Amino acid sequence: MARFQFSLEKVLRWRTVELASEEAKLKALVQEQLHLQTLLAEVSAERSKLISSLGAMPDLRGDDLRTLTACGLRLRRNAENLAQQLLRCGRDLAKQRRSYSQAKRRVRLLEELKHRRLEEWKYQEAAQLEELASESFLANWNRERI
C-alpha cells in the first residue's frame, strides 16, 4: 500500500507561509492604526487642556497669548497631520484586509482540494484491498475444491 502524497503540497506550504506574512502585515497595520488613534486622542486632550487653561490664567500678557496661540496652532497641525496619517493607514488597512482574504481563500481552496484527493485515495485503497481480499478468498476456495 502506497502512502498518500498530495502533488501540490509544496504550493500549499508556500501559500500558508504567504498567508502568515499577510496576517503579520495586517496585524502591524492594525497596531499602527491604534497607535495613531491614541496619539490623536492625546493631541485632542492637550488642545482641550490648553483651551481650558486660558480661562484659568489670571494675568495674560501679549507674549503669553502669542505663545498659547503658537502652541494651539502646533497642536492643530499635529492633529491634522495625524488625521491624514490615520486616513492613509485606513486605506492601507482596507487594502491589506483584501490581500489577507485572498491569501486565506487560496489556502482554503488548496486544503479542500487536498482533503478531496485524500478521500479519493482512501476510497481507491479500500477498493484495492477489497479486490485483493476477494482474489485471495477465491484462490483459497479454488485450492480447497481441487
Predicted features by range, described:
Residues 1-146:
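Charge-rich amphipathic alpha-helical interaction elements
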